[in-house]
Amino acid sequence: MNKDKKCSFLKGFTLVEMLVAVSIFVILVFSVLAVLIAGQRVWNDGETQMDIQFEARRIMQRMSEELTYANPDNITISDTQDAITFVVPSSYNYTTGNIEWGNQIQYFLGGVNGHTLLRREGANTVVIGRNVSSVRFTLNGDRVGIQLVLSKQSPSRNNLQVELNSQVSLRN
């Protein structure tokens, strides 16, 4: 065999072919990475949205259950409509047929930044919920309207918000 003849089967990649292949690979990797990052952001936003929806429902249920037992004559709503004060029955006297009323209960916004919903009964104040942007109470006859807005920033820096509205029928 003649050593001067080059074997046709020993051909390799040229530099240009290698650069094109690497460029296509890099574009593909960055495309997949962009899709994964977008998916993670959507996941984080969805998870944060579910968290504040759950929190809003929990807060609304707690207030609604307690307000159900209030008497419309014993309800006071602040001028700014962001606080409500009421009393609920503590017991019923079967002998006299009278309802014995308990301590005053108040729901209001407070905390360090004003985004914490608090419940005060007597000298005890407890946190009902956090991330509360606004709460609004209205009284119409024997119904209390509650508008509750919660907001929270997701890990991907999106501000998410949930608004719940409820009408509570008063029993007493």
Where are these regions (language model features)?
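N-terminal leader/signal peptides at the extreme start of proteins
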Residues: 1-13
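Aliphatic-rich helix starts adjacent to a transmembrane/signal segment
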Residues: 13-68
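Type IV pilin-like appendage domain
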Residues: 76-143, 161
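Beta-strand elements of well-folded, non-transmembrane domains
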Residues: 92, 150-154, 168-172
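A short hydrophobic beta-strand element
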Residues: 142-150
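Beta-sandwich strand segments
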Residues: 156-162
